[in-house]
Amino acid sequence: MNLEDIRDNPGARKKRMRVGRGIGSGKGKTAGRGVKGQKARTGVAIKGFEGGQMPLHRRLPKRGFHNIFRLDYNEVSLGKIQAAVEAGKLDAGQPVTEAALVAAGVLRRAKDGVRVLGTGELSAKVTLEVAYATKSAVAAVEKAGGSVTVLAAPAVAEAE
């Protein structure tokens, strides 16, 4: 057997049908699109349209809602605070607030407050002024000789 003897299996490579090239081709005139109607026209069909059948997005029930008063908190671990203190980005003598964490590069941007999580080790004596702290975080800060002040949540304006 030589290289020139190798052939594709019969029907393995089928030529593509060129549509709309005259009635003699077998796919001329309407080019396999049938006659008139929306599907015969150019352009994309309506997304989600299922030919008059109730579309999937309307068959499924509505669920949930979007709470416009939901607060978005930054979460920071004690390990990250300790790393920032060790790197000299945070001053352990000053209160650790959201603004201080943003300035130190621990957080990207200020949101509705900071939630301190108890993961990681903390040995620095720090004073935290945050919106929320877990029980384990408060215990770890107080064990290191620091303190935690939980700030009041921002007031939500009453709808009139």
Curated annotation (Swiss-Prot):
Gene Ontology molecular functions: rRNA binding; structural constituent of ribosome
Record has Cell cycle as a keyword: no
Lineage: Bacteria, Pseudomonadati, Pseudomonadota, Alphaproteobacteria, Hyphomicrobiales
Comp. bias (Gly residues): 21-35
GO-annotated biological processes: translation
Biased composition (Basic and acidic residues): 1-11
Protein purpose: Binds to the 23S rRNA.
Entry keyword Zinc-finger: no
InterPro entries, sorted: Ribosomal_uL15, Ribosomal_uL15/eL18, Ribosomal_uL15/eL18_sf, Ribosomal_uL15_bac-type, Ribosomal_uL15_CS
The encoding gene: rplO
Protein name: Large ribosomal subunit protein uL15
UniProt keywords, alphabetically: Ribonucleoprotein, Ribosomal protein, RNA-binding, rRNA-binding
Domain of life: Bacteria
Stated family: Belongs to the universal ribosomal protein uL15 family.
Database matches in PANTHER family: 50S RIBOSOMAL PROTEIN L15, LARGE RIBOSOMAL SUBUNIT PROTEIN UL15M
Record GO cellular component, one term: cytosolic large ribosomal subunit
Region Disordered: start-end pairs: 1-37
UniProt-listed SUPFAM superfamilies: Ribosomal proteins L15p and L18e (SSF52080)
The organism of origin for this protein: Xanthobacter autotrophicus (strain ATCC BAA-1158 / Py2)
Oligomeric form and interacting partners: Part of the 50S ribosomal subunit.
